[in-house]
Each structure stands twice: as structure tokens, then as C-alpha cells.
């Protein structure tokens, strides 16, 4: 058998992104008009498809449409959602609808629309290894073309890791049993689920709530028993008040990043309702639907809090879910035909990084030591997306802060800010020692400035000046990102409440 000849792209890219989710897709869109930056983004998938297993018809984003791929960095970009709506003849419908929150299906369509216009994306390419040539200061990214099987090599000076998160499964869950599934595959398994006599949803985050609501709508048609169980003491709503939303601002990121790792860990634990709760409107919709269903049918439905899943017995015709009640301290069993685990997602450093792992910095707890500018290595060459819950706080998975992070990364890569970066947008001050400075710096549009890196970093072109951009007024804080509890790197798994 002949081994395919390795194909080497001799271009030395200034920036190469691995993984094309919303955050790296947004970065690719922001890179497109920058003439002095050559970049390429790779993904093993054959096309962009955002959480296909959770594209439930009734689901919507928890962030406004302005948290698209580009608007918060460049409102004039042709890759904005508003331009997508115009180009697809739905702008007036969107205007009449008067709802800032997009259906998740539409957000996926928008991202696919952007991906098809960008020439710096390469889908169907699976990265297998990354090595560093210290003499030339170049990274060699080895990959496989999934269509042809041909080995590929790409060369670059800077890397951005955007490989995303994977479903988190508790140790006591036998996922090899087809009756046990994660919420990430819900839509693919929905037909199977609705053929069962009893379905149990575990978790109290947004994903679990959306699945329960979706299954509840047809409960009287299919006649199944539907259970919703969680270890949380109640079904917490997502905190959505405006002053709290300022905790997704650059101001709070500055404050949070300067805290000790112990204090940051404590705060993230305390702030779960700020990024793991359920949309309050959805909670109300669930209650109203329960009320309506019981008016017309004697449905079998159970909601139970304060119960921790301890084991799943798969030996019988039905699954036996074993729980412990956390307040009354007793054991209970629940028989079910199938179980959906809405237990969130966690980040794993990808295997292909082993060749350069010695360059990556970790803290005393073994977590990624992510710098303020999202760099993770000693030279400032490698950056990471959506893995900084433990270093940058609840803004890390926030779609609305994706543009801010990407603008910050581009500034670190280029040595200048191609897009204005807001540094002071919050009305509140998070650290008393900064009050005097806050008084001297008004909330005006002159608050754009460079993010100060935690280390000395050399950009590709530090002598260049910023690309001309229209003056932008300070942004308002945006909402927390949806679904699944996106997570930090190499820390305790960021799980949705179980």
C-alpha cells in the first residue's frame, strides 16, 4: 500500500487557528480586512455546525443579536448579523419581530453564512501534531485531509487554540449503554426517546431545561412518563439584572484576573447562577405548559431537586437510577427507560499539543496560566479561546465578549490594535483602590486603549498604527453565553448543575 505523500504549504502564516467554533470564526472574520496579516483556520469538521444536537426549535440565544461574530469589535463589518439579515431578506421581519434574542437555528445559519464567505477557513482538516522550530521561530502544524487521507503541514508564527469543549459525563454514568446519553446528542436521539415509556432528564442548567420543555410539549401525544431531577436545591434562574451584567465587562475581567487563584476559584463557585442558570422566561414557559397539560390530560411528570445521582444500574429492562437526597440524607431509586444527562461540558487540552506542551505555562494547581491577553506560553505565541473561566471569570464563555477577546488577541499578535478596545465601560467600580482613577477617567468614547499584557510580548508589527475605525461609544455589558456551561482549561469540570 502506497503512503500518501505529505503536502507542505510553504506559506508561513502570521496566525493559524485550530478549531472553528463561533469564537475562532469571529476571529477569522475580523482578520479578513487586515492587509498585513496572513492567517488560516483549520477544523476537522466538514462544515460549520454549532451544537447540532441542541438545535431545538424552541431554543434561542441568551445573548442579544449584537453578540454576533464581529459587531462589538467592528459595527461596520460586512459579517455582522444585521448584514446577514439584509442579505437574506429578513431584516424587516427581524425589525417587526422586536426580539433581540435570535433562535439558535438562525444563529447557526448566520455563522454558516459567514463561514462560506471567508477564504481563510479550511474545513475537513484534522490537526494531529504541533511542533516548534526554535531556530526559525516557526510552528509546524501537521494534519490529515479527512477527504483524501493526505498528510498536510502548515507553518505559522502564532497559534490560536479554539478546539472547544467536550460533553462532561459523571464517572458513575455508563455512557456505552445506548439508553444513557448526553444532552449534546439530544436532537439525534429525540425520536428514540419519544418511543420510550419513561424519560429522565438530569441537570438544572439551560440545556436540561430546554430538553425537558421540548419533551413536555408532546407528553400527552406519546404518553411517556417524564422526570426532571437535579442535585441543585432549586431550578435557579439566570441572573439577568443590568448591574450584574457588568461583570461581563473588560473592567471586571481586569479586576478578576488580578485576584489570587484561590479567590478566583471561590468566586466562580459562588457565581454559578450568573452563567449556569436557566433563562427566567423559559422557567415560566415550563410552568405554564405544565399547567396547560394537566388541564387536558393526566400526565405523568415529576420534578425533583436536591437529589444527587450516585449510580446507574443497567442490568434490567429498565435503567435503575440511584440517588441520594442531599437534605434529608436518604437513598431513592428511579426506574426509567432512558436518561438524558444535561451535565455540561469541560475543556481538555488537545492531544496534538504534546509537542509544544513544555512551552505552555501552568499554575500551581495544574491549570492553564492564561495571561490577561489570553496567551498561554512563555513567548506570547499561543493564545486560547473560551478556556479562561478560572482566570478571566464568567466572561470567558460569553458570546458577547468574544469580539473583545479577539480584538485583544489581534492586538497582541500584531503589536497594535486594529480594532478599538474598550477598557472602562462599567458604571460600577470593582476595586476600591481604583476609585480615584475611575473618577479621573470618564465613561466616554476615549476609553479605548490597548490591553496591557501580563508579560512583555512582541507583536508581528509593533511599529504599525491602528487600522482606521469609526469612533465607537462604550459598549454595554452583554448577557452570559448559552447552554452547556462552557468551561475553563484543566480545572475542575465546569458542569451544569446536575
From Swiss-Prot:
InterPro entries: FAD/NAD-bd_sf (IPR036188), Lys/Orn_oxygenase (IPR025700). Gene3D superfamilies: FAD/NAD(P)-binding domain. One of its GO terms (biological process) is biosynthetic process. It catalyses: putrescine + NADPH + O2 = N-hydroxyputrescine + NADP(+) + H2O. It comes from the Bacteria. It is an enzyme of class 1 (oxidoreductase). This is Putrescine N-hydroxylase. N-hydroxylating monooxygenase involved in the biosynthesis of the siderophore putrebactin. Catalyzes the N-hydroxylation of the aliphatic diamine putrescine into N-hydroxyputrescine (NHP). Its cofactor is FAD. Belongs to the lysine N(6)-hydroxylase/L-ornithine N(5)-oxygenase family. GO terms for molecular function: monooxygenase activity. The keyword Flavoprotein applies. NADP(+) binds at residues 62, 104, 207, 231, 275, 309. Pathway: Siderophore biosynthesis. Keywords: FAD, Flavoprotein, Monooxygenase, NADP, Oxidoreductase. Disulfide bonds: none annotated. Its EC number is 1.14.13.252. Pfam families: Lys_Orn_oxgnase (PF13434). SUPFAM superfamilies: FAD/NAD(P)-binding domain (SSF51905). It comes from Shewanella oneidensis (strain ATCC 700550 / JCM 31522 / CIP 106686 / LMG 19005 / NCIMB 14063 / MR-1). Residues 443-498 are annotated as: Disordered.
Amino acid at each position: 500500500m502506497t503512503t500518501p505523500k505529505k503536502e507542505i504549504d510553504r506559506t508561513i502564516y502570521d496566525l493559524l487557528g485550530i478549531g472553528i467554533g463561533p469564537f475562532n470564526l469571529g476571529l477569522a472574520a475580523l482578520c479578513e480586512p487586515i492587509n498585513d496579516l496572513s492567517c488560516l483556520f483549520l477544523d476537522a469538521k466538514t462544515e460549520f455546525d454549532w451544537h447540532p444536537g441542541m438545535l431545538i426549535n424552541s431554543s434561542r440565544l441568551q445573548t442579544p443579536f449584537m453578540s454576533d461574530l464581529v459587531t462589538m469589535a467592528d459595527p461596520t463589518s460586512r459579517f455582522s448579523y444585521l448584514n446577514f439579515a439584509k442579505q437574506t431578506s429578513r431584516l424587516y421581519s427581524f425589525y417587526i419581530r422586536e426580539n433581540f434574542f435570535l433562535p439558535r437555528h438562525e444563529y447557526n445559519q448566520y455563522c454558516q453564512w459567514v463561514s462560506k464567505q471567508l477564504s481563510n477557513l479550511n474545513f475537513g482538516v484534522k490537526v494531529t501534531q504541533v511542533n516548534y522550530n526554535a531556530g526559525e521561530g516557526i510552528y509546524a502544524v501537521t494534519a490529515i485531509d479527512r477527504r483524501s487521507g493526505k498528510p498536510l503541514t502548515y507553518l505559522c508564527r502564532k497559534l490560536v487554540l479554539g478546539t472547544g469543549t467536550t460533553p462532561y459525563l459523571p464517572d458513575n454514568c455508563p455512557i456505552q449503554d445506548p439508553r444513557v446519553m448526553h444532552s449534546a446528542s439530544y436532537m439525534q436521539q429525540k425520536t428514540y426517546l419519544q418511543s420510550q415509556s419513561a424519560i429522565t432528564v438530569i441537570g438544572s442548567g439551560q440545556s436540561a431545561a430546554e430538553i425537558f420543555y421540548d419533551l413536555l410539549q408532546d407528553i400527552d401525544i406519546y404518553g411517556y412518563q417524564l422526570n426532571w431531577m437535579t442535585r441543585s436545591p432549586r431550578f435557579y434562574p439566570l441572573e439577568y439584572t443590568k448591574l450584574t451584567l457588568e461583570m461581563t465587562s473588560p473592567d471586571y475581567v481586569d479586576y478578576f484576573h488580578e485576584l489570587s487563584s484561590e479567590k478566583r476559584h471561590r468566586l466562580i463557585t459562588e457565581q454559578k447562577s450568573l452563567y449556569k442558570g436557566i433563562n427566567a422566561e423559559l422557567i415560566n414557559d415550563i410552568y405554564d405548559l405544565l399547567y396547560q397539560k394537566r388541564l387536558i390530560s393526566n400526565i405523568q411528570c415529576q420534578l425533583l431537586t436536591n437529589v444527587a445521582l450516585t449510580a446507574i444500574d443497567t442490568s434490567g429492562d429498565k435503567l435503575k437510577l440511584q440517588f441520594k437526597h442531599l437534605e434529608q440524607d436518604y437513598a431513592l431509586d428511579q426506574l426509567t427507560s432512558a436518561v438524558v444527562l444535561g451535565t455540561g461540558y469541560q475543556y481538555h487540552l488537545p492531544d496534538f499539543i504534546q509537542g509544544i506542551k513544555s512551552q505552555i505555562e501552568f499554575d500551581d494547581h495544574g491549570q492553564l496560566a492564561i495571561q490577561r491577553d489570553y496567551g498561554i506560553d512563555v513567548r506570547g505565541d499561543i493564545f486560547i479561546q473560551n478556556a479562561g473561566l478560572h482566570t478571566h471569570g464568567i466572561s470567558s464563555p460569553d458570546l458577547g465578549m468574544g469580539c473583545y477577546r479577539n480584538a485583544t488577541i489581534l492586538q497582541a499578535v500584531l503589536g497594535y490594535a486594529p480594532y478599538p478596545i474598550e477598557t472602562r465601560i462599567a458604571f460600577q467600580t470593582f476595586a476600591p483602590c481604583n476609585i480615584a482613577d475611575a473618577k479621573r477617567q470618564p465613561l466616554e468614547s476615549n476609553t479605548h486603549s490597548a490591553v496591557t499584557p501580563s508579560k512583555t510580548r512582541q507583536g508581528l508589527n509593533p511599529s504599525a498604527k491602528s487600522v482606521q475605525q469609526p469612533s465607537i461609544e462604550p459598549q454595554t455589558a452583554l448577557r452570559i453565553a448559552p447552554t452547556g456551561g462552557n468551561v475553563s482549561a484543566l480545572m475542575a469540570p465546569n458542569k451544569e448543575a446536575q
